[in-house]
């Protein structure tokens, strides 16, 4: 879950492994995102916190009824929250790519940055991606890499598809993934 920041048990959804982002880095990313026309989404293990939600994103979240979110007015609302992922949301992907170009190099080195759904720039700690999480899960379950099939459709799935013994892209995959 969350690009590999969480590994949950299918039996009861308890957290098997969690990888959090540095709180200080999250604070800097939040302040940076405030300069742009983006909805900022901050994920903890069980709650999605949203700053500057727009109508389009609100409709999308309502469509996914299982998504519990809380609107926030500032980063201060996140005091004591263990942050596992952040996202900048804008429906213009070129705009998100421009934001990435303006990020300090040290952030790019500290982050695992990916894009998804033609609307999100996803920001995780550098140690996190779906491929690494799949490898950890395979080790926990004693499953050989060659016995794993991974299916994906977005840029954030690339590491998982590459790790698996058989990587599959769905028919409508982004071209650079397939």
Task: Explain the meaning of each model-derived region.
Residues 28, 32, 36-151, 155, ...:
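Conserved acidic, metal-coordinating active-site core of Asp-based
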Residues 175-177:
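Conserved small/polar residues in nucleotide/adenosyl-binding loops
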Residues 171-172:
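Zn-dependent metallopeptidase/amidohydrolase metal-coordination segment
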């Amino acid at each position: 879950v969350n690009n590999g920041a969480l590994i949950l048990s299918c039996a009861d959804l308890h957290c098997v492994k969690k990888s959090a982002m540095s709180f200080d880095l999250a604070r800097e990313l939040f302040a940076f995102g405030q300069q742009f026309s983006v909805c900022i989404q901050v994920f903890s293990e069980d709650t999605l916190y949203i700053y500057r939600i727009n109508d389009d994103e609100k409709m999308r979240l309502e469509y996914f009824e299982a998504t519990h979110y809380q609107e926030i007015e500032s980063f201060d609302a996140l005091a004591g929250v263990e942050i596992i992922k952040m996202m900048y949301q804008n429906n213009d992907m070129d705009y998100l790519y421009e934001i990435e170009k303006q990020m300090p190099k040290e952030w790019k080195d500290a982050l695992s940055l990916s894009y998804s759904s033609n609307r999100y720039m996803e920001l995780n700690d550098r140690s996190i991606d779906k491929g690494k999480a799949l490898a950890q899960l395979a080790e926990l379950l004693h499953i050989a890499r060659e016995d794993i099939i991974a299916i994906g459709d977005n840029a954030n799935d690339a590491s998982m598809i590459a790790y698996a013994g058989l990587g599959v892209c769905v028919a409508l995959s982004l071209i650079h993934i397939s």
